[in-house]
């Protein structure tokens, strides 16, 4: 046997052993024997670099190469599921499906694992891409990190799998691994992860795949997409995928009646506490893919599936004290410090009290025995007090009057529950929070910078506002702790590249209260430059589509602050884009002038957002709901039956994708 043949043999053997150990939980060899085979493979691969294979089992150990993730557009959007919380809502879902299909159907019941969603693409039996959910339209390419997860096959075995397909699932951190990781972080005085989902998500986004490999992530796969799938049944496809090497939950059940669905839910509402990974509900899916296609989608979720969320678990523990946190907007949030208590698989020591009204309503006293609940199984909150357990009444909890970080007097705006620190220019958490928002992906998208780096730069006195970022030089940061030459250069490069971010995102990045992405786009489209916006009157602002007086007043207040104007001036000097691009109107027409158009369904040639732009480009107006004033509906595949019914009732014209494209030619 040649060394090349031995490499191929070892790869095949190690793939099989990985599957037996991590998926079947039935190892055939000891860990020592596995490691010996792996070392032999690594030695041979080092001798024969020309025989490198990205899907070799040796690639699972990870690499310490630091690279930025690229964004990948999903071939099929990763939509979220509609949530339900009661048997009544489950019954309503079941009845809707029954009415729409008017034929027999089965419901596939699956555990709703609480991790981070992933989409895996396989071509010719090999893993070629792993992408996070992201915003549902596009996500991060984390293929290198996913290859370190032993329960995900790099190369499929068996036969019958399509030439190309996607399989989706959940990346998880088992409870035992989560507890071990937090113990290690506590020993190193590092911040603890709040729950396994955050730990799994954070791990998957690490730039160092060697660390990812050490975190022992797991994965369950739950949905196949693509052409030429083996079966019409979703459940049956999962069974086939299991034969190809995927880890499929053996808890999934196919139900023929609503009562069977409820029996499944009730059983796992109790037994889920004994599972090795976090779950927060049950997913119900119509089993037939043909029936799924017939039912279609809403704008946000499929009509053929829902998520039933378990009721939050409660525990009783003692309130020791109340501390306060300040967010980037200056909102002050009270936090209850508790005796440690086990709740939904994690140790809870702190819980949110939300605002002063909640504290007053609970009539809280230090030393009270309080009921703690995890909303959605994740965020702990106090929901009640056991007043019968009061033997000695401690001090009544009263909301603070001054900022715990900078000492400024707190204010409460009319109609709001929260108290605010208005010292936004000198309050450390607000400063750091604003900078973190500024550098985020949807804003300036500055690679290499994150909350830890922002905190480090702030502590070193290098930055005090967002404009300070543009004065940084490589020499300023290269000698900082955990900062090398390459990292420093990447950060400066990322800051420089952010100068090309369009005006609408710069406006969003400033963090003006109530000015989110959508508002920023509308404002930028109306005012074209930061100067024009700064000079706008209240009347000018409220005439912008969807901008009410509250948002307008917030914008005026922002520009009335000399410190904010100074920051904008320094951003201008740095070269940040404070004007909108000259809009190319050469292709604008009035072919759709005066027409109100509703978009519905899934399209082949353009995305929904692209069609919205085309409608506006040709003089039309996008509207969200059908009425007698609707000119026509641009309908793609899987148009919702309720919209179709309403359109027919009102006599609204249905226009296909091809017909629409001909209209604007």
UniProtKB/Swiss-Prot annotation:
Protein name: DNA ligase
Residue ranges constituting the BRCT domain according to the UniProt record: 587-665
Role played: DNA ligase that catalyzes the formation of phosphodiester linkages between 5'-phosphoryl and 3'-hydroxyl groups in double-stranded DNA using NAD as a coenzyme and as the energy source for the reaction. It is essential for DNA replication and repair of damaged DNA.
Family: Belongs to the NAD-dependent DNA ligase family. LigA subfamily.
NCBIfam families with a match to the protein in the record: dnlj, PRK07956.1
InterPro entries given in the database record: BRCT_dom (IPR001357), BRCT_dom_sf (IPR036420), DisA/LigA_HHH (IPR041663), DNA_ligase (IPR001679), DNA_ligase_CS (IPR033136), DNAligase_adenylation (IPR013839), DNAligase_N (IPR013840), Hlx-hairpin-Hlx_DNA-bd_motif (IPR003583)
Record organism: Phocaeicola vulgatus (strain ATCC 8482 / DSM 1447 / JCM 5826 / CCUG 4940 / NBRC 14291 / NCTC 11154)
Keyword Zinc: yes
């Amino acid at each position: 046997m040649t060394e090349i043949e031995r490499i191929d043999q070892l790869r095949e053997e190690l793939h099989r052993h990985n599957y037996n150990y991590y998926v079947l939980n039935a190892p055939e060899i000891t860990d020592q024997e596995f490691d010996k085979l792996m070392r032999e493979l690594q030695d041979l691969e080092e001798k024969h670099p020309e025989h490198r294979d990205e899907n070799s089992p040796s690639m699972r150990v990870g690499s310490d190469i630091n690279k930025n993730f690229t964004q990948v557009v999903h071939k099929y959007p990763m939509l979220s599921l509609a949530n339900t919380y009661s048997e009544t809502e489950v019954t309503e879902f079941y009845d809707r499906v029954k009415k729409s299909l008017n034929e027999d159907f089965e419901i596939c019941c699956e555990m709703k694992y609480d991790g981070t969603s992933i989409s895996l693409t396989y071509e010719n039996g090999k893993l070629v891409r792993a992408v996070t959910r992201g915003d549902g339209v596009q996500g991060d390419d984390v293929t290198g990190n996913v290859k370190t997860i032993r329960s995900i096959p790099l190369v499929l075995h068996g036969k019958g799998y399509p030439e190309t397909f996607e399989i989706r699932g959940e990346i998880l951190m088992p409870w035992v691994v989560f507890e071990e990781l937090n113990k290690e972080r506590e020993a190193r005085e590092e911040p603890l992860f709040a729950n396994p989902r955050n730990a799994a998500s954070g791990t998957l986004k690490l730039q160092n795949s060697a660390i990812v490999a050490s975190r022992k992530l797991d994965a369950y796969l739950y949905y196949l997409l693509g052409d030429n799938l083996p079966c019409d049944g979703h459940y049956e496809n999962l069974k086939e995928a299991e034969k190809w090497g995927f880890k499929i939950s053996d808890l999934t059940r196919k139900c023929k009646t609503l009562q069977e669905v409820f029996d499944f839910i009730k059983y796992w509402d109790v037994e889920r506490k004994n599972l090795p990974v976090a779950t927060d509900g049950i997913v119900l899916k119509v089993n037939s893919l043909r029936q799924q296609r017939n039912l279609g989608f809403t704008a946000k979720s499929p009509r053929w599936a829902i998520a039933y969320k378990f009721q939050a678990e409660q525990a009783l523990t003692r309130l020791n004290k109340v501390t306060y946190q300040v967010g980037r907007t200056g909102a002050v949030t009270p936090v209850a410090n508790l005796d440690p208590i086990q709740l939904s698989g994690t140790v809870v020591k702190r819980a949110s009290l939300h605002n002063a009204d909640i504290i007053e309503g609970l009539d809280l006293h230090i030393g009270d025995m309080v009921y703690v609940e995890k909303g959605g199984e994740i965020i702990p909150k106090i929901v009640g007090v056991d007043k019968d357990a009061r033997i000695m009444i401690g001090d009544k909890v009263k909301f603070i009057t001054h900022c715990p970080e900078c000492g400024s007097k707190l204010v409460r705006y009319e109609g709001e529950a929260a108290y605010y620190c208005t010292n936004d220019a000198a309050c450390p958490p607000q400063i750091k929070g604003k900078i973190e928002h500024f550098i985020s992906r949807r804003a300036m998208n500055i690679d290499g910078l994150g909350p830890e780096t922002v905190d480090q730069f702030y502590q070193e006195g290098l930055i005090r506002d967002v404009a300070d970022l543009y004065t940084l030089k490589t020499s300023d940061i290269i000698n900082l702790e955990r900062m090398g030459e390459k990292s420093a250069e990447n950060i400066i490069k990322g800051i420089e590249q952010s100068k090309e971010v369009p005006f609408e995102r710069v406006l969003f990045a400033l963090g003006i209260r109530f000015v989110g992405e959508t508002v920023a786009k509308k404002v930028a489209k109306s005012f074209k430059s930061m100067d024009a916006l700064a000079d706008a009157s209240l009347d000018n602002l409220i005439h912008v589509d969807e901008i009410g007086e509250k948002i307008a007043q917030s914008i005026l207040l922002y520009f009335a602050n000399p410190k904010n104007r100074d920051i904008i001036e320094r951003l201008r000097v740095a070269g940040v884009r404070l004007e909108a691009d000259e809009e190319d109107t050469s292709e604008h027409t009035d072919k759709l002038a005066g027409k109100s158009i509703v978009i519905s369904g899934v399209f082949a040639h353009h995305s929904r957002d692209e069609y919205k732009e085309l409608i506006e480009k040709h003089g039309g107006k996008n509207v969200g709901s059908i009425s007698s004033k609707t000119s026509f509906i641009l309908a793609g595949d899987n148009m919702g039956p309720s919209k179709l019914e309403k359109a027919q009732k009102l006599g609204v014209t249905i226009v296909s994708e091809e017909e629409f494209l001909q209209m604007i030619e």
